[in-house]
Amino acid sequence: HALLRAALLSAGAPVGEVRAQESVTLEELSVEHVGEGAGRTTASGRGTIGLIGPTPGYGAGAAVSATRTATPQIDVPVAVSVAPRETITDIAATRVDRVFDYLPGVARQNNFGGLSIFSYAIRGVTTSEIYKNGFPLNRGTPPPPDAQNIERIEVLKGPGAALFGRSDPGGLVNLITKQPTAERFVEFGNQVDSFGLTRGTIDAGGALSADGTVLYRFNLAAQGAGSFRDFVDSDRLLVAPVVSWQVTPDTRITVETEFVRNRIVFDRGVIALNRQLGFLPVSRFLGEPGQSTYQNNNSLQVRVDHRFDENWQLRLATYFNTGDLAGESAEIRAIAADNRTVSRDRNVRDYRWDVAVGQADLVGRFDTAGIGHTLLLGMDRESTDSRTQYLRSNFRTSPFALDIYAPVYGQALPPITVPRNNLERITNTGLYAQDEIVLSPEWRALVGVRLDIFEQSFRERAVRSQVDQSRVAASPRAGLVYRPIPELALYTNVGTSFRPNTGPDAAAVTRGTALPPETGLGYEVGAKSELFGGTLLLTAAAFRVERENVLTPDPANTGFSLAAGAVCSQGFELTAQGQITPELKLLAGYVYADARVTKDNVLPVGAPLINVPRHSGSLLAVYEPEGAWRGFGVGGGVRGVGARAGDAAGSGFTLPAYVAVDALAYYRFDNARIALNVENIFDTAYYESSLNVFRIYPGSPRRFTGSVTVRF
């Protein structure tokens, strides 16, 4: 790791956030351009469609993921949970999935051995839909996103297909990146933890031209990390420069790039014996030491924002992503009758992907007969090419055995006998329209629809099979808001979703036919309230999400999938976010979700969905006093997750409920910030998620993290 260590030392490493020098005022049509300095950007100003600047504290008064405009949340008939930059900093998150623990209604799912963009469940519905500035990140097999260049995380609840296209009805995640700033600064930080993390970061920004029309932002993160898991370590390097050019007062061009190098040890966690946990220490590694997987992921965004006049605005954007993954792992497939000897297979992966996306959005504001409109018209085109070479041994003929209680590693590697070599091309064209309608001071409506034209060509070269499919789908959405008083809004919405089932399936590939697409329906009723002058947002919602033709792991054919029929999730959620006082900030929520199979030829009707707890909740609170103690901050977090199904086969295997407590303290002085975080302060033993009895991911034992940030 010599190059990585050198990068860490030279970087000085930052963990802190860039603090806005002024509060941000948002309007329906536009958002602040970070580089504009004090004041606000009006509808005639220089905002970017689909982006939003820094917000102070834990504020969530506006979010762009629901409508791609910065309409205040209380006026939008959709629920969006937000984790601003201060949340990421307060919990010392290095990856965005750590923040999910404090976003209500988001449950962890399969993390693919730590390799890729994790899957998660929103409102009980599993998804891997994650976006960055509105562009899809879950194409190919990129590494989990680093938190260093993230300004805020938004979780859209309910169907988002009316804007984003093929997706899942429970919701999606959209990451908003840090943007160029006129304020000149450079921030160095360093972060270490009790499991061997050494992390360095840089965050810098300012003007590149004397007249301030060319601005930049540069983020770097370099780290080497250990783990509470034996033989599991990782290295990661992120380089993320952004440059914006204000060509004219009405036109701005932004170029944003990101380069990621990632090395990890593929880790499927621990196993259960007779569907019971706790027989093995959570540190026990059941793979093969020394086997690493390497990932390269490079992306480019180019955005052109143009203002025609005070009411009309155009955004043209392109996104390119290319990456590759290569490595080996050993994974458990069976256990012998002695309940201690497991059979493993050897897995060799070589993946490559190329993604190109083009987007065009036109936003206009106008009145018709006294009714106000904010109209969004858009189109996008996506092309994804991927090659997946996945080779493995046969655990039945070459068991690659391991004693789980007294493991002896370093056996001769078994021969590769089961090849899989896939080529896949996906193209998708979307046309969409949305209207935010102001019917009166009390009543607002949201209507929208998207048309998707989807094409897929899938080739399995090893067995010379082929699947081609074309689909056309319309995804409508509608909602209504009633504000009887300025501080309260009652709302309802309904929307649909569409997702083609792609990739290999045992039956479908041999027949040469495609699986039917997943379809979804979601609807909710709720209330939002802004308290304390709008600094605290409360949301209550009752929801129901239905999904058909769900693709789930096939228990009879490892590595393949089947369409499970229909599932349903219904429940309610309560959230509170923002500032209770200038000294106290809060992010809290509780979710009740009853998520079950409603129709299936394999799984029992009524079986709970994997990794979805019926009860879950979290609370993160930070207090920073004024006066003589100004600069000190103390806080804590509580994460509670109920019992949930541990596999998708309806076997009765259950992950136990848990409550984990975190604590934090920091001190800001002059241009520095020092902090101490303690994750799982009471060292609670728990399990985050599982895929089946052979793939169970234990939660972290007590972890101490120290960080220092210096800003110039």
Each language-model region and where it sits:
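C-terminal beta-signal and adjacent terminal beta-strands/loops
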Residues: 639-647, 666-712
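Face-selective signature of the C-terminal outer-membrane beta-barrel domain
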Residues: 300-323, 345-459
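Acidic/polar loop-and-plug regions of large Gram-negative outer-membrane beta-barrel proteins
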Residues: 223-227, 239-307, 320-353, 396-428, ...
